[in-house]
Amino acid sequence: MLFLINLLHKWLKLLNRSLNGSQMVAFTFAMLILCGSLLLMLPMASADGSSMRFIDALFTATSTSCVTGLVVVDTGHYFSWFGKLVMIVLIQIGGLGIMTLTTLLSVAVGKRINLRERLFIQESLNLNEPSGVVRLSLNVVKYALTIEFIFGTILAWHFYSALDMGLTGIAWGYWHAISAFCNAGFDLFGDYASLTGHYNDITLNLCIMALITIGGIGFTVLDDLRRNRKWKKLRLHSKIVLTASAILTFGGTLVILALEYTNP
């Protein structure tokens, strides 16, 4: 593990000399997508042991890494557990950001983050200034893993007990928690059905909605809420995001309810 971390750190330092922040973010995502594509093409990634076409693997890896949610195959039925594991790892890395995870690994092994690397992190997190980016990066990982673990545990127990899925339900719970928190839009229910077969499952839907909302408001807002509990002390950005999210969520609910109320 230490060897891989050192290798990754040296590789990023080499790229630092020739790429600016935006180019660095784009390049690392391109490499993530390429690696994901190759893994999804392996016979062990599909349920029937066949190799996925490169164009389909590339599309799937791009969709998962960029948390888009578009599919060209039935995720629940086409992929094996290895393929589903590759997908959720791509979703997690894409949701957190490669530079964020690189920062975590560097800090974990005691490596110092220089100014240029801080600028890259600033670019990847869409921040206005480089100050505090290392602290925020570490908090990003902490927030994500904590929230995903809490809701993943709830969903795992729900799948295990209420839906009687056994041990498979535990894996499903954490898989869907990560997917929902990263706003990826992927699911394992199969038949391209998403949650339509569970529209009356209150626990499942409330957890998914909460994860989508919390993940959607962004890590900078979550960090601001943690440090400033009072509305007046929040940053303008946080106030705008929270207000807009509330208006769109509840306003959209009322509009859809009014338009679809008589629809059977």
Task: Put a short name on every predicted segment.
Residues 1-264:
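Membrane-proximal intracellular helices of multi-pass ion channels
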